Swiss-Prot record:
It holds the Pfam family UQ_con. Residues 20-176 form the UBC core domain. It comes from Drosophila ananassae (Fruit fly). This is Protein crossbronx. PROSITE patterns: UBC_2 (PS50127). It comes from the Eukaryota. Belongs to the ubiquitin-conjugating enzyme family. FTS subfamily. SUPFAM superfamilies: UBC-like.
Length: 242
């Protein structure tokens, strides 16, 4: 009987711990939503909240027009343990902070360890935005041998034409697979559909109408508009109201 009671208490404690963790992860997602990060879309997996799916849209600079899929893997005891989340791209991404072998983004230069209550996932995504917006600035003051991709760093500093060409190869390769069959049946996996005028046209027109209305409202009250987004075939640009 004593053993049964002990087992029951352990199960109850585990359940409470799991619920608390799920609540904290949901809070992280809500914070990301409230930040309205431009060009980055993420969502937790339906099956496992410790795994997230994401897509990065480059807007300018070397990575303009890029569409890179990535996953976020959270430590088992996130956010209470000091281990950092992992961001892993699904394809090659030429960048000094991205490992060419594992495709993992190194965030340790901004986050030495995870501080529960102080560090948040939206900050990690902001960091991702910043290093792709200005890769040169992202490596300033960092020794080359401390970077995940020393070759990328050397090209960035000494042969930017070649660096840009390598990045364009990555972008072309990524776009070539944007409509591939999802590698998982998880309903939260981010899927792109080719633009079909008869199906998506009416939706696009409603978006445009809403954008015009929102812009008029924004001019009137100085507020920020939000709304739906879509992607035109061949362009990969979110037609979002921002």
């Amino acid at each position: 009987m004593t053993l049964d009671l002990d087992a029951s208490k352990k199960d109850e404690k585990l359940l409470i711990t799991t619920i608390q963790q799920e609540y904290k992860i949901l809070a992280e997602y809500k914070m990301i939503e409230s930040e309205k990060l431009s060009g980055i879309y993420v969502i937790p997996s339906y099956e496992n909240s410790l795994q997230w799916y994401g897509v990065f849209f480059g807007r300018q600079g070397f990575y303009a027009e890029s569409v890179f899929r990535f996953s976020i893997l959270l430590p088992d005891r996130f956010p209470d343990e000091k281990s950092l989340p992992s961001i892993i791209f699904q394809q090659d991404v030429m960048h000094p902070h991205v490992c060419p072998f594992t495709h993992t983004l190194d965030i340790s230069h901004a986050f030495s360890e995870w501080r529960c209550g102080e560090d948040h996932l939206w900050q990690v995504l902001k960091y991702m935005q910043a290093i792709f917006f200005d890769p040169v600035d992202s490596i300033r003051g960092i020794e080359t041998d401390k970077l995940k991709n020393a070759e990328a760093a050397e090209l960035l500093m000494n042969n930017r034409q070649e660096y840009a060409a390598r990045v364009q190869e990555n972008i072309k390769e990524s776009k070539a697979h944007i409509y591939d069959t999802p590698p998982t049946e998880d309903p939260h996996y981010i899927v792109f559909e080719k633009f079909q005028p008869d199906v998506h046209g009416p939706v696009l027109e409603r978006i445009k109408a809403g954008r015009n209305k929102a812009e008029a409202s924004q001019q009137a009250n100085g507020g920020h508009a939000t709304g739906l987004s879509w992607v035109k075939e061949g362009e990969f640009k979110p037609l979002s109201i921002e």
